[in-house]
Amino acid sequence: MSKTVDLLGQQAEYYLNHTCKTIDKKLIHVPGPDVIDKIWVDSDRNVRTLNSLQALYGHGRLANTGYVSILPVDQDIEHTAGASFAPNPIYFDPENIVKLAIEGGCNAVASTFGILGAVARKYAHKIPFVVKLNHNELLTYPNSYDQVMFGTCLLYTSDAADDRISV
């Protein structure tokens, strides 16, 4: 903590002992081990979604605190792999991305369907996966910022466990 105080300098007291007086504490959902029961259970989310959320909140170094740390890696698709991974070429390999998330104690790893699909058999039971479906198509000129869905997966909507959308 002393390093933090040193970094904050003269403003350490202000930042570390700040009490908000503009928003009533009762209006805030404070993270905690019961976040699924307090926030999500009464929502319209289906049972599988609630189960997946509990797996996510219950995994990694922040397990059951109500906080999450997710390693998001989709740079190789959206922003070219050369620009993103050239300094660390081992991350061209999807397995190393997942290993990094596990070693870092992340609650989950988020990436594209292809990246996660390539390593799912080996790692899906070791860390929750979050599939990112929102990708811009930046391969053409001029750039198109339309969201392009690609890959093949099955999504369950929050309306009912039986509703399925094939992407």
Where are these regions (language model features)?
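Active-site mouth loops of central-metabolism enzymes
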Residues: 75-92, 132-147
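Conserved, mostly hydrophobic/aromatic
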Residues: 71
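Conserved, well-structured core domains of diverse proteins
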Residues: 1-40
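Active-site loops and adjacent core secondary-structure elements that bind or stabilize anionic groups
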Residues: 5-18, 50-51, 55-59, 94, ...
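Short, acidic/polar
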Residues: 92-99, 145-155
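Single conserved hydrophobic/aromatic residue that forms the stacking wall/gate
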Residues: 156-167
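Alpha-helix-loop-beta-strand connector modules within alpha/beta enzyme cores
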Residues: 120-137
